[in-house]
Amino acid sequence: MYYAAKAFICTEVARWIKDIGIGIDVCTGGELSVALAGGIDPAKIELHGNNKSVAEIEKAVASGVGTIVLDSLYEIERVAVAAAKANKVQRVLLRLTPGIEAHTHESIATAHEDVKFGFSIASGSAWEAIAAVRSHSSLELRGFHAHIGSQIFGYESFELSAERLIGLLAKYRDEFKSELPELDLGGGYGIAYLPGDVAVVPADAMKALAAAVHSNCQTHGLKVPTISIEPGRAIVGPTMFTLYEVGTVKDVTLENGTHRRYVSVDGGMSDNLRPSLYGAVYTTVLANRTSSAQNVSSRLVGKHCETGDIVIREIDLPDDIVPGDLLAVPATGAYGRSMASNYNHVPRPPVVAVKDGKARVIVRRESEADLLRLDI
């Protein structure tokens, strides 16, 4: 298992990953640096990304990264050159596009044909990539990788992806009289954001995928390869919440004579872009006190100069909410802090970890001095 660092990574989280003993997948030189700073064994690191720079590739090879997942013909050449220059044989996987329409938002669906990631099985570019890798003595092809998207519920798309990848493993065996030993089926397991949502448990997904892999390998007469998955959201998403302070409460009259209450908080799209980017939905609760007031239909909005800076479009909140109240938005651990920005020059909030009733800061709050630090 590899933890998908893009969901959320900092040095302390990297230390936890090291202590747990699982691997980690990173997709930039920056994420690689954090993983290494946290003491993760480079052999347990996978490097992803559709546009790795030469510098990132050379850093990965020099650091001893266990596997580089190749995403283009250019990249095959670049990794081969970097490995040869370092007098190493670099283990690689090929990222494949199995041509699957995962049922999720179009911005996080990654395995259909019209997408920037991977080599298409259907078009034949995957076979071209196989030939390219095999032409380099500095590369060792270990197997195939596919990631069909994010926030996916159910196993059908994952099982179909496994079926198509194993079909290509069989074709490889028939052509080259040898079997590739690894199959990485990515992540993307959905979590609960609202009451009533049913999350996908990675351990259960792994069992279902293992059964599908075994069945398809038996059909093709293949040995069962080592299977990997890459959960990120499913691990970190439910473990974190964002705590906002209410700044203003405003009632507005709409054109049809109805009213809408706007509750503005001290964050928004700079700490959680997902509602604006994907239309992601969340819930929230009053966190600093209890209230017996009647609920009022409200819109929770951020402090940024954007009409679209909406945290929750429609939510029932107590009628007596006032400035200074605290609102907790759960399930913000994935793609919140990791996609955060300094839009409007708003400093990013801290990250606080809680264990056994004790809290400690693991990423400090940014200051205005931090925002000015790189200016010349």
Language-model features, listed with the residues they occupy:
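Gly/Pro-rich active-site loop or hairpin
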Residues: 113, 196-199
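Active-site-proximal beta-alpha core segment in soluble small-molecule metabolic enzymes
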Residues: 2-182, 191, 212, 217, ...
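Short, electropositive alpha-helical surface patch
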Residues: 152-167, 198-207, 240-247
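Anionic group-transfer/hydrolysis microenvironments
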Residues: 27, 73, 97-99, 147, ...
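Flexible glycine/acidic-rich beta-alpha junction loops that bind and position SAM and/or redox cofactors
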Residues: 101-104, 181-197, 227-239, 272-273
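Charged (often Lys/Glu-rich) extended helix/loop segments that serve as interaction or gating elements
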Residues: 208, 214, 222-376
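Aromatic side chains
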Residues: 2-3, 8, 117, 158, ...
